[in-house]
């Protein structure tokens, strides 16, 4: 694969390992950017991944957050096209073998910065009742707490016309997407989401899929400034 796929890591080694396995199964050897993890299990996992050459592991001396790959020095050395993701996704079992090339084609078709996986919140699995923090208002800040379905439903409201793919105009932060630098025009969230066989499940939303134990989640949320989950 000539398109590098970056996976961001911070005290969530069990998810990183799961993500690497999914990518390896698709003949992809990803690059892991670790945000100075302190969790012993995560460090052991990263050491094993390095030793077995399942991925390239780059360890940062500081926690740069979920957007570590977009810090100046990192982003500047990335090629014109690359992939980036948080590790906590369950890929679609019917994901096309050429999904990277198809997503790149979607970027070209819509001339958007990124094209990634849609994240359905209605599935065969029960949805968590935990809430997320929503920050609104640029002049006068306002915060409210919403359920996953309340937050995510808006990302399915703007279908786009395409000959064979189900696509929605919707922002993407750091869940899986292919990026095309030449289409960046100042909006980091400029994106489309591809559904159907490209849909992935965000595992922490579904208790039956969530891989983190309470202890592991505590380690993950400690010092994690990127998460919108209420820390309970």
Question: How should these model regions be labeled?
Answer:
Residues 3-15, 19, 33:
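A conserved hydrophobic helix/loop-capping motif in glycosyltransferases and polysaccharide synthases
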Residues 9-12, 35-36, 67, 91:
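Preference for well-ordered, secondary-structure-rich cores of eukaryotic proteins
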Residues 33-45:
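A conserved acidic beta->alpha catalytic loop
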Residues 42-81:
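Active-site-proximal specificity loops/subdomain of glycosyltransferases
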Residues 65-68, 74-75, 90-190:
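Conserved catalytic core of nucleotide-sugar-dependent glycosyltransferases
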Residues 168, 174-232:
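A glycosyltransferase accessory/donor-loop signature
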